[in-house]
A protein has these predicted regions:
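Transmembrane alpha-helix boundary signature
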Residues: 59-69, 87-93, 111-125
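Membrane-embedded alpha-helical core segments of multi-pass
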Residues: 79-84, 101-113, 138-148, 164-170, ...
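Membrane-interfacial loop-to-helix junctions in multi-pass transporters
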Residues: 129-139, 184
Length: 354
């Protein structure tokens, strides 16, 4: 336990000390966040806070885990993604360029270091081994999916950092139960870095993590879970991060359905996501974020419980929880374009001018 405590404290201390340094650096180079159609803050706030999270995580991992083959692959890929994030936070990269960077970052541990979903344990069917033609693209898609899921929820002070930290705790607990020291320590390091950053990022935020941080958080969570799936029951290791991030994943899927049905481009930002609908109901930022934390903690605990239950009982519990969550989200209006997106307003302007 001392090793885990040391891992946590190193990440916590390094991130806490470096965040103000990164904040001043971001201001000096003009890397500041401006309000847009998805965000609710006012004024310019420095970003690049993800650099401090990255530094805290890396120093902690190197000091405690060392350079294991799998972690080197993840760290190299994460470093490349950090470079992409910095470029995006400073210069606002085109979406296609950013996606290409994400694909390359995901491919580094998967293709070069052979960290991929090689097999899954399916109840009644047993272990199913996946050929490379399926395993490689599936793992890359898995990592990119998590990267963008965390990136998309980074719209309120402390939201992405808190949700990712809770998910990291859940994965750390699972890895600890399964005797996976490296995966558990990596997630403990992420927990320490996330908690330290929240001291500056919780409402009212003094600094944002930017794409540098949100993409990094999603990357580490997904890549470490894949690393864990190579050494134990793959199904359990992959289910926990999926359920832990149920809230942002479901919110993203509902947003895609909403935009498709309204004829709005999928990547067009708006204020119809779950956090925005909660704000519209009269909750303040802190209250909304705490509600999202509570939901994430609930689904994380559910994940840690159902993996120990029989198949059909586990499926029933998860299905009921998901249905209730989706019905609640629909009632709040996340399936409707209640607040017109910039795309819709632009289309209306064109129509009125014709």
């Amino acid at each position: 336990m001392f090793a885990y405590a040391f891992t946590f404290l190193v990440a916590l201390a390094v991130t806490f000390v470096l965040t103000p340094v990164v904040k001043n650096f971001a201001i000096r180079i003009g890397a500041v966040d401006k309000p847009d159609a998805r965000k609710v803050h006012h004024g310019l706030i420095p970003r690049l806070g993800g650099l401090a999270i990255y530094a805290g995580f890396m120093v902690s991992v190197i000091a405690t885990i060392g350079f294991t083959y799998e972690m080197v692959g993840i760290m190299v890929g994460a470093t490349f993604l950090i470079a992409v994030g910095i470029a995006d936070d400073v210069y606002s990269l085109p979406p296609k360029v950013k996606l290409l960077g994400q694909i390359i970052a995901a491919a580094i541990p998967v293709v070069i270091f052979n960290i991929n979903i090689e097999w899954i344990d399916v109840p009644r069917l047993g272990i199913i081994y996946l050929p490379e033609i399926i395993s490689l693209p599936l793992t890359i898609f898995w990592i990119i999916g998590f990267v963008n899921t965390v990136n998309l929820i980074d719209g309120l002070d402390g939201l992405a950092a808190g949700i990712a930290t809770i998910a990291s705790i859940a994965i750390a607990l699972l890895a600890f139960q399964m005797g996976q020291w490296v995966a558990a320590a990596a997630m403990v390091a992420m927990t320490g870095a996330g908690l330290a950053f929240l001291q500056y990022n919780f409402n009212p935020a003094k600094i944002f993590m930017g794409d540098t941080g949100s993409m990094f958080l999603g990357y580490i969570i997904s890549a470490v879970s894949v690393m864990g799936s190579m050494k134990t029951v793959a199904t359990a290791v992959l289910i926990v991060p999926l359920l832990a991030l149920t809230v942002p994943i479901t919110d993203t899927l509902l947003a895609i359905v909403r935009r498709k049905s309204s004829g709005v481009p999928i990547f067009s930002p708006d204020k119809n996501h779950l956090p925005h609908r909660l704000l519209a109901k009269g909750l303040n930022q802190k209250q909304v974020v705490l509600v999202m934390y509570a939901l994430t903690a609930f689904f994380s605990c559910t994940a840690l419980i159902v993996i120990h239950l029989s198949l059909w009982i586990g499926i029933a519990i998860v299905a009921i929880a998901l249905v209730l969550f989706v019905l609640w989200a629909r009632k709040l209006g996340v399936m409707q374009e209640i607040v017109p997106s910039p795309y819709q307003m632009e289309q209306k302007k064109k129509k009125d001018s014709d």
